[in-house]
């Protein structure tokens, strides 16, 4: 790899041994992927995927202590993934004991480290850092050093930023050094589409199911999606933002997609059209039957397949303000239709602290509370990682949470019926 004189000097120790190790780590990372050079990180803010102080990762926090002691702070302020704990989320005393004494015992230490390393504020913990209410929204063409898969695929695809699917710690090192290896999605060639996906459904496809189908088919490749614009339009509005957020998270978790193009909608597809597609790209046709086949392939790992759900999570990735308002109205309407006043299953909606703050200023916040739904900032997966949570029959509208936990997937319509009518 060819480094600039400044980068080479850091590697040689001009800023101390710790910064030399940071640069060496990035160089080795780039070498592994054939990068020939480093390029500057040009976004205003960074983002780190590690937001939890779990005992098993104590060596990570020890390494962060070394960075802090050496003054190796991030060159850019950053946001972080959601926090793991919220006393308002339903849990029993045994679960709380495991959360606080065994799983997240390092939490206070780690949050203190993030404050020293450069986190924007104590409320900037979310997987949807790119939403306006949070403010970490990169511009088209900006180079990022992020790792959170749902944020990376959104930034690459919907915003046109440039970021690889980095790992945790590597992404923070890129922010500290101010540069990242030049390969993959940072290059023009790496952003070309390897697959053509033709959407031929008879109704608007569930974003979680469509994303899942595409992710499992193309894996880490780049899909160019045709026919979806007839269902979600050709403008990046609030509906499209919510749809693409959930769609992208499913492609990234059910597969390994880091970039997708939606014909007539996402910026590079609008600007370049089919010129983005590689010669000889295979075609994947998705119709109603294919989506049904994909859904029926999901395993259910509950001990009792007919168990009554004990908890419901919606918001993985975190919900948008538009989604919170829309879903509040839908829950209210369904409760009225079923002659109920409050949800029949303990239900948690999750959103970014900044989004929750904005939601609390609307008339919908007290209305949601009146339905019995809990609004939280946590990461549902961090809750589900508790062994006692894994044993619970939990339902979710998130295909990402389904993939990474024992939660059982249902569509949003099904979830709303289940929590307002009851389900067995």
Regions flagged by a language model, labelled:
Residues 1-424:
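Non-transmembrane, aqueous-exposed alpha-helical and coiled segments at domain scale
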């Amino acid at each position: 790899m060819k480094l600039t004189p400044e980068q080479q000097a850091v590697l040689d120790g001009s800023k101390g041994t710790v910064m030399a190790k940071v640069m060496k780590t990035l160089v080795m990372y780039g070498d592994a992927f054939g990068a020939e050079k480093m390029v500057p990180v040009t976004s205003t803010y960074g983002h780190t995927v590690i937001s939890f102080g779990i005992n098993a990762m104590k060596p990570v926090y020890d390494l962060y202590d070394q960075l802090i002691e050496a003054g190796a702070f991030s060159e850019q302020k950053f946001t972080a993934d959601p926090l793991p704990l919220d006393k308002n989320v339903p849990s029993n005393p045994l679960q709380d004991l495991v959360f606080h004494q065994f799983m997240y015992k390092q939490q206070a230490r780690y949050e203190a480290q993030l404050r020293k390393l450069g986190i924007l504020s104590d409320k900037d913990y979310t997987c949807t850092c790119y939403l306006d209410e949070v403010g970490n929204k990169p511009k088209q063409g900006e180079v990022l050093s992020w790792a959170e898969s749902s944020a990376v695929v959104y930034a690459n695809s919907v915003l046109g930023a440039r970021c690889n699917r980095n790992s945790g710690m590597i992404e923070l090192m890129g922010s500290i050094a101010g540069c990242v290896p030049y390969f993959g999605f940072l290059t023009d060639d790496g952003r070309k589409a390897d697959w053509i996906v033709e959407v031929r459904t008879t109704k608007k496809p569930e974003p979680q199911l469509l994303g899942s189908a595409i992710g499992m088919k193309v894996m880490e490749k780049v899909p160019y999606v045709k026919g979806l614009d007839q269902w979600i339009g050709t403008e990046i509005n609030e509906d499209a933002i919510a749809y693409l957020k959930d769609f992208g998270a499913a492609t990234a978790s059910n597969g390994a997609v880091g970039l997708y193009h939606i014909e007539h909608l996402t910026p590079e597809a609008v600007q370049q059209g089919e010129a983005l597609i590689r010669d000889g790209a295979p075609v994947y046709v998705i119709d109603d039957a294919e989506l049904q086949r994909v859904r029926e392939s999901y395993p259910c790992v509950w001990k009792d397949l007919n168990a009554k759900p004990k908890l419901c999570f919606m918001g993985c990735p975190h919900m948008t303000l538009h989604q919170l308002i829309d879903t509040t109205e839908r829950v209210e309407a369904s409760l009225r239709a079923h002659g109920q006043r409050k949800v029949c299953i303990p239900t948690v909606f999750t959103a970014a602290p900044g989004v929750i703050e904005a939601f609390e200023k609307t008339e919908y916040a007290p209305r949601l509370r009146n339905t019995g739904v809990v609004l939280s900032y946590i990461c549902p997966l961090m809750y589900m990682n508790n062994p006692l949570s894994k044993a619970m029959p939990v339902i979710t509208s998130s295909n990402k949470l389904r993939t990474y936990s024992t939660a059982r997937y249902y569509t949003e319509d099904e979830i709303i019926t289940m929590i307002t009518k009851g389900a067995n």
